[in-house]
Swiss-Prot record:
Pfam families: ATE_C, ATE_N
Protein name from the UniProt record: Aspartate/glutamate leucyltransferase
SUPFAM superfamilies found in the cross-reference section: Acyl-CoA N-acyltransferases (Nat) (SSF55729)
Entry annotated with the keyword Repeat: no
Length: 249
């Protein structure tokens, strides 16, 4: 991880750039570095205030005219699967997720590249090298973990180990009040498994087991098709001018 000398957060504002979600809009972000002994505490507070983490930076939209980005968190304790979600959960019952320290591997990067090339070829992350990927995973001063999903082995119920190829990966921050899903990716040719949905369901179960009330999904952008999946996990809360407000869908 990189090291910065300051202990107190200093905030900065980016220059305007094209919005990746809404055509014709310009985005700006306010950001700070998450460093020092209080990085975990600051990350918790900022995430609860609508920030997201990328490497050792916490950021949130600060657009001049648009307020479409809305922070979303699932109420894990009240969540109930829909019929379709139960089907997804059942389809992936042969998978097991194992928690690791935030350390990259060549196997992870190969899966990451397959995912980007298939799903986000023209996106802002499409040219990430293996070094860029390693920095995305390792450059953190907060409580971050990697969850690797593999098929269950014959001794999985005793050892909690999966067997076989790597199928999906989630980069997750563990906070005082929940789990924050920073980034996730999966084998793109297994569309019938709905692995993105499955990993969110798995995080909800993990939050419940740990007694944590929330799963943070980042931003929902009304009008952006790629973000619509986030509001299917109800009940949830949306962050607005009056704080977190309940949303039932």
């Amino acid at each position: 991880m990189t090291h910065q000398p300051q202990q107190s957060p200093q905030f900065f504002l980016t220059a305007p750039s094209p919005c990746p979600y809404l055509e014709g809009q310009q985005e700006r972000k306010v950001f700070t570095h998450l460093v020092g002994d209080k990085a975990n505490e600051i990350n918790d507070l900022l995430t609860q205030g609508g920030f997201r983490r990328s490497r050792n930076i916490a950021y949130r939209p600060a657009c001049e005219v648009c307020r479409a980005c809305i922070s979303v968190r699932i109420l894990a304790g009240e969540f109930e699967m829909t019929r379709n979600m139960r089907r997804v959960w059942s389809q992936n019952r042969d998978l097991i997720g194992r928690v690791h320290k935030a350390q990259p591997s060549t196997e992870q990067y190969a899966l990451f590249r397959d995912y980007l090339d298939a799903r986000h070829r023209s996106g802002g992350m499409s040219d990430m090298t293996v070094l860029d990927y390693a920095m995305m995973i390792e450059d953190t001063h907060v409580n971050t973990q990697i969850i690797e999903y593999r098929r269950r082995g014959p001794d999985s119920f005793m050892s909690a180990k999966g067997d076989g190829e790597l199928i999906a990966v989630a980069l997750t921050d563990v906070m005082a009040d929940g789990l924050s899903m920073v980034y996730s990716f999966f084998l793109p040719h297994m569309q019938e498994r709905s692995l993105g949905t499955y990993m969110i369901l798995d995080h909800i179960e993990r939050a419940r087991a740990a007694g944590l009330p929330h799963v943070y999904l980042g931003y929902w952008v009304e009008g952006s098709r790629k973000m619509q999946y986030k509001i299917r996990f109800t009940p949830q809360e949306h962050l607005g001018p009056r704080g977190w407000q309940r949303f039932e869908g």
